[in-house]
Curated annotation (Swiss-Prot):
Organism placement in taxonomy: Bacteria, Thermotogati, Deinococcota, Deinococci, Thermales
Coiled coil: none
Domain of life: Bacteria
Family in the record: Belongs to the class-II aminoacyl-tRNA synthetase family.
Protein name: Histidine--tRNA ligase
Keyword Zinc among record annotations: no
MF terms (GO), sorted A to Z: ATP binding; histidine-tRNA ligase activity
InterPro entries linked to this entry: aa-tRNA-synth_II, aa-tRNA-synth_II/BPL/LPL, Anticodon-bd, Anticodon-bd_dom_sf, His-tRNA-ligase, HisRS-like_core, HisRS/HisZ
Catalytic reaction equation(s): tRNA(His) + L-histidine + ATP = L-histidyl-tRNA(His) + AMP + diphosphate + H(+)
Enzyme Commission number(s): 6.1.1.21
Organism name: Thermus thermophilus (strain ATCC 27634 / DSM 579 / HB8)
SUPFAM superfamilies cross-referenced by the UniProt entry: Class II aaRS ABD-related (SSF52954), Class II aaRS and biotin synthetases (SSF55681)
Length: 421
C-alpha cells in the first residue's frame, strides 16, 4: 500500500502554504503592533492541563482529544486549543511579575479527533491571542477589535461580529438550573449528545448542531443567557459595547452565543463570514478570569481569542482573494557542455542568497534550456558554453524581451540586481 497522509490531515505546499504564511504574517503585524509577545508552546501537554483548563465535561475533552501515555506512564495530550497552554506558560515563567497586562500571541497546529469536513481537520492551524493580568473591559473590547483587524487587514469584508456574555459562575449556575427545569421533561426529544449535556453542562445544548435540538429550543421558547446576567456581568458587557461603538466596530448582540470551552466568563464573541457555509465562524474568544486557578496558579484574569487559519483561507477564497503565482528564479543557468555543469553550480552559489539562482544538472541544447527557464518562470536565462568558460563570461538573456548581453562573471550580480530593481 502506498503511504498517504492520515485522514483529516494534509500536506501544505505551494499556493496553499503561501496563503497560510500570509495569514500568519498579517496576524503578527496586527498583534505585535498592539504589544503582543510571540510565544511558542510544545504541541503536547500533560493531559490535566486540558482536563482542568478546558473542562472535563466539554466535547473537546470527552470526545476530541488525542491522548497517549509516555514511557513513564504519564498521560499526555496533543493540544486541542492554545489558551490553556499559554496560561500554563504564563504561570510557569513567572510572567505575573511582569508589567501587566501581558499580551501574548501564538500560531501553530492544534489537534482534535473530529469528523473531517470542509474547513475542519484533525490537524488544523490557529492563531491565538491572550491578554493576561487585568479585568478591565477595555481589554475585552481590544480583543474583539484585534480579531476583527486581523481579518480586515487581510482584505475580508463580509464579516459579522457577534457579541454576548456567559455571565459569572453564579449566573451560569442559575441558568443551567433553569435549562434543566425546562428541558428535563423533554429529555427524550433531545439528541443523544444533548441528553448527556443536560446532565453535564446544559448550556452546551444551545450550541447543538442538531436540527432536532434547535427546533425544540425554539418550540419551548427557551430564554437566553443574557436574561440571567447579574449586575456586574451586565455592567461589564455594557462597557465592552460602549468601547466597540466608540471605535465604530460593527457588532450585533447574539443571545444564543455559547463558546465551547468551560473556562469562559462574561464576554464571549465570534467573527463569522457570510459565505463559507455551515462552518461560518472564523474565530472567537472571550474572558476567562478563573483559568489560572484551575491550573494550580493564583487568580489571573484574562481575555483572548483564536482564529482558524484554514477557515480564514476559505473565506479569502470565497471573496476572490488569491495569491500571485510563485516567483520563479531570477536566473536559470543553462550549461551547454558537461564541464559547464559544475561551473553553473559554482556561479549559482556565488549569486545566492542575494539572487534566486537555479541551474540545469546536465548539459542542455539552447532551445531546451530556454524552454526549461520559461517553465520555471525565470526572469533571465544564463548560457555557459565553451566560449563563455574560456573567457570567464556568461551570456544572459532577458526572457520577457529577448534582450541578450554577454558579461564577465563578476559583472553578473550587479547587472541582475539593477535590472530586477
Amino acid at each position: 500500500m502506498t503511504a498517504r497522509a492520515v485522514r483529516g490531515t494534509k500536506d501544505l505546499f505551494g499556493k496553499e502554504l503561501r496563503m497560510h504564511q500570509r495569514i500568519v504574517a498579517t496576524a503578527r503585524k496586527v498583534l505585535e503592533a498592539a504589544g503582543a509577545l510571540e510565544l511558542v508552546t510544545p504541541i503536547f501537554e500533560e493531559t490535566q492541563v486540558f482536563e482542568k483548563g478546558v473542562g472535563a465535561a466539554t466535547d473537546i475533552v470527552r470526545k476530541e482529544m488525542f491522548t497517549f501515555q509516555d514511557r513513564g506512564g504519564r498521560s499526555l495530550t496533543l493540544r486541542p486549543e492554545g489558551t490553556a497552554a499559554m496560561v500554563r506558560a504564563y504561570l510557569e515563567h513567572g510572567m505575573k511579575v511582569w508589567p501587566q497586562p501581558v499580551r501574548l500571541w501564538m500560531a501553530g497546529p492544534m489537534f482534535r479527533a473530529e469528523r473531517p469536513q470542509k474547513g475542519r481537520y484533525r490537524q488544523f492551524h490557529q492563531v491565538n491571542y491572550e491578554a493576561l493580568g487585568s479585568e478591565n473591559p477595555i481589554l475585552d473590547a481590544e480583543a474583539v477589535v484585534l480579531l476583527y483587524e486581523c481579518l480586515k487587514e487581510l482584505g475580508l469584508r463580509r464579516l459579522k461580529v457577534k457579541l454576548s456574555s456567559v455571565g459569572d459562575p453564579e449566573d451560569r449556575a442559575r441558568y443551567n438550573a433553569y435549562l434543566r427545569e425546562v428541558l428535563s421533561p423533554h429529555r427524550e426529544a433531545l439528541s443523544e449528545d444533548s441528553k448527556e449535556r443536560l446532565e453535564l453542562n446544559p448550556m452546551r445544548i444551545l450550541d447543538s448542531k442538531s436540527e432536532r435540538d434547535q427546533a425544540l429550543l425554539k418550540e419551548l421558547g427557551v430564554r437566553p443567557m443574557l436574561d440571567f446576567l447579574g449586575e456586574e456581568a451586565r455592567a461589564h458587557l455594557k462597557e465592552v459595547e460602549r468601547h466597540l461603538e466608540r471605535l465604530s466596530v460593527p457588532y450585533e448582540l447574539e443571545p444564543a452565543l455559547v463558546r465551547g470551552l468551560d473556562y469562559y466568563v462574561r464576554t464571549a464573541f465570534e467573527v463569522h463570514h457570510e459565505e463559507i457555509g455551515a462552518q461560518s465562524a472564523l474565530g472567537g474568544g472571550g474572558r476567562y478570569d478563573g483559568l489560572s486557578e484551575l491550573l494550580g496558579g493564583p487568580r489571573v484574569p484574562g481575555v483572548g481569542f483564536a482564529f482558524g487559519v484554514e477557515r480564514v483561507a476559505l473565506a479569502l477564497e470565497a471573496e476572490g482573494f488569491g495569491l500571485p503565482e510563485e516567483k520563479g528564479p531570477d536566473l536559470y543557468l543553462i550549461p551547454l557542455t558537461e564541464e559547464a555543469v559544475a561551473e553553473a553550480f559554482y556561479l549559482a552559489e556565488a549569486l545566492r542568497p542575494r539572487l534566486r539562482a537555479e541551474y540545469a544538472l546536465a548539459p542542455r541544447k539552447p532551445a531546451k534550456g530556454l524552454e526549461e527557464a520559461l517553465k520555471r518562470g525565470a526572469a533571465f536565462a544564463g548560457f555557459l558554453g565553451e566560449d563563455e568558460l574560456r573567457a570567464g563570461e556568461v551570456t544572459l538573456k532577458r526572457l520577457a524581451t529577448g534582450e541578450q548581453v554577454r558579461l564577465s562573471r563578476e559583472e553578473v550580480p550587479g547587472y541582475l540586481l539593477q535590472a530586477l530593481g
